[in-house]
Amino acid sequence: MPLLGDNLAKQLGTTGDSNRTDRMGLLMLISPPGYGKTTLMEYVADRLGLIFVRINCPALGHDVTAIDPANASNSAARQELEKLNLGLAMGSNVMLYLDDIQHTNAEFLQKFIGLADGTRRIEGMWQGQARSYDMRGKRFAIAMAGNPYTESGEVFKIPDMLANRADIYNLGD
C-alpha cells in the first residue's frame, strides 16, 4: 500500500504522534479499463473502515458542470449528484470515489479543487438547500479514476489546477 498510503495519510490523518492537522490532497488513478482501480479503492476503503461512495461519471456526462442535482439533464445524472451530495453530507468516515472521470466536463472536476487543498471545503446541495461542506479534521478522502483516453480516442487531459493538487498514479505503465 505504499503507493496509496502516503496520500491517504495526508487526507485522513494518521494516528499517534505523527498525526497531521493540515489534511489535504487528492488521489488520482489513471489506467486503461480493467486494471482494477475501482476494486482496489473499494478494498482500501473497506480496510480503513470508510464508507465507499462511488460516483459513476459516465452517467453525468459532459453536460453536468455543477454539483446541484436540480440542474442535472437526466435522472441518471441527478441520482449520481444526489449520491455525491449524500457522501459530502455524511462527512466523516467517507471515501468519495469519482470513477471514469474522462467522461465528465473539466469544469465539473474543478469543483473538487477546494477539497484537495488546505481549505477542504466544497459547495454543494443537500435536500434542495445550498450547503458549504467543511471536511477539515474529518476522516474524508477523495479519489478519482480514469482512462488515459476519452471515448473519441483522444488523450484525456486532467485540468491543470486539479493535477497540481493531486497525487497521480498511472497504473498502466
Residue ranges of each PLM-predicted region?
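Substrate-gripping "pore-loop 1 plus following alpha2 helix"
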Residues: 7-11, 69-83, 108-137, 172
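Walker A/P-loop
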Residues: 18-55
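Short loop/turn elements that form and flank the Walker-type P-loop nucleotide-binding site
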Residues: 22-24, 48, 89-92, 136-139
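Conserved AAA+/SF3 P-loop NTPase catalytic/coupling segment centered on the Walker-B
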Residues: 89-117, 153-161
